Amino acid sequence: MAPPSEETPLIPQRSCSLLSTEAGALHVLLPARGPGPPQRLSFSFGDHLAEDLCVQAAKASGILPVYHSLFALATEDLSCWFPPSHIFSVEDASTQVLLYRIRFYFPNWFGLEKCHRFGLRKDLASAILDLPVLEHLFAQHRSDLVSGRLPVGLSLKEQGECLSLAVLDLARMAREQAQRPGELLKTVSYKACLPPSLRDLIQGLSFVTRRRIRRTVRRALRRVAACQADRHSLMAKYIMDLERLDPAGAAETFHVGLPGALGGHDGLGLLRVAGDGGIAWTQGEQEVLQPFCDFPEIVDISIKQAPRVGPAGEHRLVTVTRTDNQILEAEFPGLPEALSFVALVDGYFRLTTDSQHFFCKEVAPPRLLEEVAEQCHGPITLDFAINKLKTGGSRPGSYVLRRSPQDFDSFLLTVCVQNPLGPDYKGCLIRRSPTGTFLLVGLSRPHSSLRELLATCWDGGLHVDGVAVTLTSCCIPRPKEKSNLIVVQRGHSPPTSSLVQPQSQYQLSQMTFHKIPADSLEWHENLGHGSFTKIYRGCRHEVVDGEARKTEVLLKVMDAKHKNCMESFLEAASLMSQVSYRHLVLLHGVCMAGDSTMVQEFVHLGAIDMYLRKRGHLVPASWKLQVVKQLAYALNYLEDKGLPHGNVSARKVLLAREGADGSPPFIKLSDPGVSPAVLSLEMLTDRIPWVAPECLREAQTLSLEADKWGFGATVWEVFSGVTMPISALDPAKKLQFYEDRQQLPAPKWTELALLIQQCMAYEPVQRPSFRAVIRDLNSLISSDYELLSDPTPGALAPRDGLWNGAQLYACQDPTIFEERHLKYISQLGKGNFGSVELCRYDPLGDNTGALVAVKQLQHSGPDQQRDFQREIQILKALHSDFIVKYRGVSYGPGRQSLRLVMEYLPSGCLRDFLQRHRARLDASRLLLYSSQICKGMEYLGSRRCVHRDLAARNILVESEAHVKIADFGLAKLLPLDKDYYVVREPGQSPIFWYAPESLSDNIFSRQSDVWSFGVVLYELFTYCDKSCSPSAEFLRMMGCERDVPALCRLLELLEEGQRLPAPPACPAEVHELMKLCWAPSPQDRPSFSALGPQLDMLWSGSRGCETHAFTAHPEGKHHSLSFS
């Protein structure tokens, strides 16, 4: 077939691909990879599942199952994408045309630097796509450009870029057809490779101009053709250049309404979803998109009918909930648009966070539902299957069932067998026939299901290499498991599996909590007894800036007769002091005077079990569903942090708000108290059925899976409204209950009973993640069970506030915090210019608001206010995992004062954290912090921001494995025409962290931040020891000269080549990095983008992931590092 000429119709024009007279068929178009028309798959009458159509299209295109999740089906005009679960019905008089396209995009598809598929080792990471996917992506992009689907401007720059793309396209054609450029141009016009708007523009030019353009294209084509690049390299270059021409083309946008709006302009909004940015939104005329969350931050997505009547009855309300319980609500004009959005977010979540999770069944891929039902992995590679068996102990007979990475109709069974040399791993092939039966190669007869086939193997019917093998245990998929199905992006940590190791026991010196003096506490009445404590109501008195503060608190005093459990009691306090979440009780601190006393916020309505006993059957099912869903949110937060609670029960669930006048109830999970790991068997038996069975077998084992068992028991407790039937049994019968693997009596509500049964599975690995629990609870909330079970449904339905409480603030600007709702809790820090306080933003006035850190100025003159506003604007524009999150601002009366509201990180600054926990922080952890700070600074540099105050005191600790850069009070944005900034009024400055050019000429740049980063490395590896701090070391070098200013003497030392010494036991490679950062000339210092890979390599080497020499710094000897 002749190549396309200038007049040849371009795909995907329906007139050249389908006849309008064709009826009663469904057609799926694939982008044309050659000179011919697009390939078409046709399907006849009946129902067709969208995912099945995608599989057929993938087979026809040569797409492997590993890459299947990047694709989806869309309408011809791309106005609507279909979820994998969509069913197309083909009738006699209907013809439907669909496009099979890549829907899920990531930046820099082709290298491993910015994004890649996860590998067991860094050198085993693989690219996101392979060559067939690359060819498909090229054909898709080219079709969009030449058909005019991709909007392209007509500026001179854009015209030049489009002509460059045409040259690459022509060079690719010449490679494919083995033609010389001159021969190709005889049959193909370069204008056939341009967008229609540019073709029309060129056609209107004079003959001389058109001739000049043709000559330019011909010369450029000859130069490109002379290169040795193959067709795939030319495709990759084409795609990269096109993505630079239209950087926003990889994102999808959705026009939505805002709930509660009465129509009109103010009720409109826009959602944007992108693989490298997550979800962003804008409202009304606002042009700047506000980031809402990245995909790993999503906990829950729900779809329900919008509360409207009349023509808008088809509208759907989609609610997205973040890990911090903030919600985004958007109203879509119909169900297809809502499902399209949810399917997009759902797919990105599986690609970036958890390949086995789905947020709602309406968009769940049927193949994924089959995998969940059959306990089967997706198309993971053999390396990950073997690694999973090794992680499980390489027990003979253990196996992994997975989809084939090469064939859509095959499964692979990887089995661990024992031979004289140790464990070995064998593979078996399972084929699915067109009729739906399964046949394992080596077995004589097919089976109707995978479960039936594997049951045969469990009975010893499996032979591998002539050896009979009996299957013993299945290594099932776990939430957030790392595999080749996960895409890792630079600046994002790969997902952490929820299956964590048993909780470690910390020494008393390693615990973290605020110590409260005894004379600041006021004791009131006794409220009862806990298992190991006496409980009182009280008040805490503080004096802040000369103002007396009084806070109502709960005092939990450790009983003197249980002093052997003191350490575990303080561990619980340490746990609660390191978390900040609205559904977790706030711990003010611990009073160590006399008997240890835990000081907590006071929750007025008390434990939920006592409340339910008082109200009896008057509490509707919808109210109880809200309670258990909020409890699931709290436990999901702890699961994401890898922190087991260990003592989940209704008595630990406190009711902060009863819920009335359309608002839902609000609960808080209390501290765990004494851990099951230190309790005797008798005490553990007393906690049956809330304590997980594995905790009785191995008392030291406390995992996240135990919390799921306790949650299931608590759900039963809440919905039954009666005393737990097992609690009154004698200890022997309680133990027998577990030994016989009995279950609690099943509620009449079948779906609820199934959820409880899944949470209380006797095999810990069988229990669902809390994200999955929240998803299942959503389906219960949307059901009609309460109409059958509530005593007076007619009276309760109008007051059933399932969502109304959350909608009260949906249309307000979430970044504006009303000052009167910021409730002071304690002071976090105070400096020369300002102070930072811990506050609760509580607009409902019932202690249900989120904890935030609030910064305010000490002196509020015009200059300070201007600098403070600049700091706020800088922080507001920064969005990185390694920079403290901006929440908003709070204005005083008449906007005469301003406060900055940020996320609250309970562990405080890195300097204090290193000093407190030096004993358990090794070099590997310090290198992890260094790498994260470097990534944060690299991001700042990309935004042309100079920090100017980078020091350990300005790094905050989110968790023991995550730090964030904070305090942008001195930060500056570089001018567009310069790479440095000259400060005219330096003021008070941290001179011992400053580069020489900053000290001498007040010049600040990204290179001066690199110098400060070297000082931060020094701080890290000295653990911020005050005796050898940067200031102490430099002052020691200066000697006793009092007449010379410290700044001048410091500058003389630096110009003489004096530098901070190598920290004790600091790895030589790290000290070499410090010295590179301290190069006298800014041009000689490495960039943060060059430092990042070096630190990552050192960190990987310290963890044993790569072969790397990692030695302590010997006296006077150094090892050199090279940067490429």
UniProtKB/Swiss-Prot annotation:
Q: Boundaries of each Protein kinase domain copy?
A: 521-781, 822-1111
Q: What's any one GO cellular component for it?
A: cytosol
Quote the Gene3D superfamilies the UniProt record gives: Phosphorylase Kinase, domain 1, Pleckstrin-homology domain (PH domain)/Phosphotyrosine-binding domain (PTB), SH2 domain, Transferase(Phosphotransferase) domain 1
PTM characteristics? Tyrosine phosphorylated in response to IL-2 and IL-4. Dephosphorylation of Tyr-980 and Tyr-981 by PTPN2 negatively regulates cytokine-mediated signaling.
Where is this protein localized, as stated in its record? Endomembrane system; Cytoplasm
**Entry's free-text remark on domains:** Possesses two phosphotransferase domains. The second one probably contains the catalytic domain, while the presence of slight differences suggest a different role for domain 1.
User: What's the protein name?
Assistant: Tyrosine-protein kinase JAK3
The upper taxonomy is: Eukaryota, Metazoa, Chordata, Craniata, Vertebrata
What gene name is given for the protein in this entry? Answer: JAK3
